[in-house]
């Protein structure tokens, strides 16, 4: 009888742990980094944002094509009928700054969580720039986003 109670208790514990793990697991969201854009010099709002249209994109970014033989120097095309753009823009600086997205996850409540790190390194440059990252995510993940700066 004692062995049966031990087995039942162990099974209940295993099932509870498995259900808890399944209920709290976030789904990773794939994304693509947009290339060859720059932050417009009239942008004053540096808060992270989700961009839903070409018009909205053009309020914050310009296109910066570069020469290449294979066409890789063109700005990434964004189809706003299928994708949203996520922009993380930092304040103007003269120190090398990297914005790295550590994860984008869809939570069980339907919201997305975007975690990112900002690191600065090196000596000051004689010029300044506005560090940013611009990534594309599928619209199926929605546009209710929480940004977490790590």
Where are these regions (language model features)?
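Exposed, flexible binding/inhibitory loops of compact, secreted disulfide-stabilized domains
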Residues: 22-150
